[in-house]
Amino acid sequence: DYYASRGLGDVYKRQVYDSYDEMFTDPDVDIIYITTPHNTHYGFMKKAILNKKHILVEKSITLNSDELGELIALADENNVVIGEAMTVYHMPIYKKLNEILKSGTLGRVNLITMNFGSFKEYDMKNRFFNRSLAGGAMLDIGVYALSVIRWFFDSKPDNMLSQLKTAPTGVDEQASLLLSDKEGQMATVMLSLHSKQPKRAMISCENGYIEIMEYPRAWEAKITYTD
């Protein structure tokens, strides 16, 4: 509600806009944080870029690689920066674990096992299950697991197998994935919007393994050396 927002804006001395377009075209705005549902990211990002605004956008940044590729090219043309608010790439714990792995004490990473599950009451209007809002397990929670895998893999995965269980709306309610890269590293992912699972990552190496609990917002990890 614009008038309710206006009242808060007056209290906290913040600018309030009557429309998205008004915000995108405001010359005093340098950067925009986009937190709307996934299906709106592409359109809002494109408008922001064309108005020379830098962007931080919630995951998932876009619905597919074609959308993202177009926006990256457009951002380069307009000399603006776009970034995805993915926790994994910016947390100190992951940088520290990367340092430990690079030291060689654990040996090579061979297998990564990821779990992420929660129970959501089925509601076709809820964004988790609404296809028009780009719902589903992969775009909502799977991106965390894939980001961890990409962080620890030596190269980009070039092979993927998947199996899905779909909700009545057609979105992926549960999913299992098997990924591998050209170096022979493998990863398995189990996702669910209809089953409780720990948010657990296991990084299995030649000389031991790393366990990360609550990996989307991890603050600690357990390292076990088997030699």
What function would you assign to each model-found segment?
Residues D1-Y12:
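Single conserved hydrophobic/aromatic residue that forms the stacking wall/gate
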Residues G69-T87, R108-L111:
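Rossmann-fold dehydrogenase core element
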Residues V88-M160, P168:
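Predominantly a Rossmann-like dinucleotide-binding segment in NAD(P)-dependent oxidoreductases
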Residues D18, V57-E58, I82-E84, I212:
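Hydrophobic residues in well-ordered beta-strands that form the structural core
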Residues R14-I72:
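Beta-loop-alpha module in the N-terminal Rossmann-like domain of NAD(P)-dependent dehydrogenases
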Residues I31-T40, F44, R127-F128, A137-I149, ...:
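Structured catalytic cores of enzymes that bind and process phosphorylated ligands/cofactors
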Residues S147-W219:
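Contiguous beta-strand/loop segments that form the cofactor/metal-binding neighborhood of enzyme cores
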